[in-house]
């Protein structure tokens, strides 16, 4: 009898030791994650500081780029791709700058660039006036759509309602007065796919702004554009001889699927009407748009299957977001299989790949899209690829913080911040300090966080929430461009077991979301476990 008792006691003790060893391994990994997260944060902050030195002294606006167009701010580049991620960086890492200079730039941009109502046009620092004497409606429509989708949407995903979401809703309201379904964008500057790009931009904006506001006007407009494209006459894979599966064209695929996700919840009859067209479009892209690894070509003819541009699209993840979303809605396994095939090919075949003719932007977009999908399908080799490729991206940064000196530099910060939030499991410091190392590991029902600092620090550890729900009111967290991944989302109304250096207490989720107070002494390391 006693022999069995001691055996059980021994086994129980062994299990406890194993659990403790596993937990310590998680805390050790969290510390390692904190080192790379810290580098991502520092590089993003350095980008912000570098670009602020290039701002126009009179207006405070940043130029379109540093090699040409140095005298202008435009909606579809400076406003859409660079400035928003300066704002985002400041919101995480430099609160005084966020509340001050970043808001000032928004106010100045709104005052100086609004030309047709609240719709922005290109502003010249040198002329102290609009760059073009005459109003070019195509340029204004294109710039407005790009500013909303690429710039103001990600800020709203991160911040929720804010002055930037108000700017977007103002642009959207005034754009509604001059366009319904965009069918003509004049000017060769915008490439061969400007019409579908603007249509896709609007669909993505309308889908998310409908959920944010519940304004039926945005739903009706989105359905109007969806009805146009999801039809016998205008389905992109039937009507287009050139279908771009990279940015500046692939937006239409993602946009149609985002609006499909909306109607799948609020209008089942419309969802049923659109479903055959959505599936046909995606099936055609799978049949004619991929290479042997399941990644997409830059551009194909969907009618003949001709590959027009054989370069592999760095935006493959954006298009796969659409496939995975339809998989979530319709449970069509082929769309998940397509995602898994592409992801599984990355580490073996696309390390240090030349995504966009040597540009950092190609790496930034490829990494962002992959992180979205890795959240849903955590394949080990994908983690290895992400950890490898972020270093390739970081090598583009110059000593002054500038990346390549054009508007695409903003995407460097966007992706670096996303990477850091992965390595911190969505947690942040209320008052970021570059000397404080903190990282996390999310494992099933718990997140393990390690913090250390060479100097004393006090502040709050802010946990990540269900951003899709609390910021945009989305009904489910489908993969989408410009979202911020939820690695360990805290729910405000639930209770969690918080253990700090071995001492446990129950804490409401709302407290964790607001930030839990912590203090670090010089050279101290703190281990925090949060358990569902």
Language-model segments: residues:
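Glycan-recognition and catalytic cores of secretory/periplasmic carbohydrate-active enzymes
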Residues: 20-530
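Bacterial Sec-dependent N-terminal signal peptides
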Residues: 1-22
């Amino acid at each position: 009898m006693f022999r069995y008792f001691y055996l059980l006691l021994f086994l129980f003790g062994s299990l406890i030791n194993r659990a403790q060893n596993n937990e310590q391994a998680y805390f050790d990994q969290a510390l390692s994650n904190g080192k790379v997260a810290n580098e991502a944060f520092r590089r993003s902050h350095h980008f912000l500081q570098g670009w602020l030195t290039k701002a126009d002294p009179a207006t405070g606006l940043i130029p379109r780029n540093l090699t040409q167009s140095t005298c202008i701010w435009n909606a579809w580049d400076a406003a859409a791709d660079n400035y928003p991620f300066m704002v985002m960086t400041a919101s995480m890492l430099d609160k005084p700058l966020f509340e001050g200079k970043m808001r000032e730039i928004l106010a100045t941009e709104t005052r100086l660039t609004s030309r047709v109502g609240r719709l922005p046009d290109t502003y010249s620092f040198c002329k102290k006036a609009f760059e073009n004497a005459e109003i070019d409606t195509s340029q204004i429509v294109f710039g407005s759509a790009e500013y909303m989708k690429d710039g103001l949407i990600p800020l709203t995903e991160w911040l929720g309602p804010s002055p930037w979401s108000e700017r977007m809703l103002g642009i959207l309201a005034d754009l509604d007065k001059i366009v319904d379904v965009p069918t003509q964008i004049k000017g060769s500057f915008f490439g061969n796919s400007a019409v579908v790009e603007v249509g896709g931009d609007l669909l993505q904006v309308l889908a998310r702004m409908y959920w944010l506001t519940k304004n039926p006007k945005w739903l009706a407009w989105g359905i109007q554009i969806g009805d146009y494209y999801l039809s016998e006459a205008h389905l992109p894979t039937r009507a287009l001889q050139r279908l771009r599966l990279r940015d500046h064209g692939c937006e239409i695929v993602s946009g149609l699927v985002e609006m499909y996700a909306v109607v799948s919840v609020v209008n089942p009859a419309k969802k049923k009407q659109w479903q055959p067209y959505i599936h046909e479009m995606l099936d055609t892209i799978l049949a004619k748009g991929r290479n042997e690894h399941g990644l997409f070509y830059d551009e194909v003819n969907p009618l003949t299957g001709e590959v027009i541009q054989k370069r592999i699209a760095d935006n493959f993840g954006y298009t796969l977001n659409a496939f995975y979303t339809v998989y979530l809605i319709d449970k069509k396994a082929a769309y998940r299989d397509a995602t898994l095939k592409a992801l599984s090919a990355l580490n073996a075949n696309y390390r240090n790949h030349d995504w966009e003719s040597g540009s950092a932007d190609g790496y930034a977009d490829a990494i962002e899209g992959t992180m979205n999908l890795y959240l849903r399908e955590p394949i080990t080799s994908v983690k290895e690829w992400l950890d490898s490729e972020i270093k390739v991206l970081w090598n583009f940064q110059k000593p002054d913080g500038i990346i390549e000196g054009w508007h695409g530099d903003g995407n460097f910060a966007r992706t670096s911040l996303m990477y850091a939030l992965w390595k911190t499991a969505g947690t942040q410091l209320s008052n970021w300090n570059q000397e404080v190392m903190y990282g996390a590991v999310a494992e099933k029902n718990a997140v393990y966080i390690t913090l250390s600092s060479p100097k004393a620090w006090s502040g709050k550890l802010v946990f990540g929430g269900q951003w899709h729900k609390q910021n945009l009111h989305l009904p489910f967290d489908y993969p989408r461009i410009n979202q911020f991944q939820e690695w360990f989302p805290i729910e405000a109304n639930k209770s969690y077991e918080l253990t700090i250096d071995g001492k446990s207490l129950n804490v409401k989720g709302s407290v964790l979301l607001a930030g839990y107070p912590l203090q670090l002494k010089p050279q101290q390391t703190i281990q925090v476990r949060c358990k569902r």
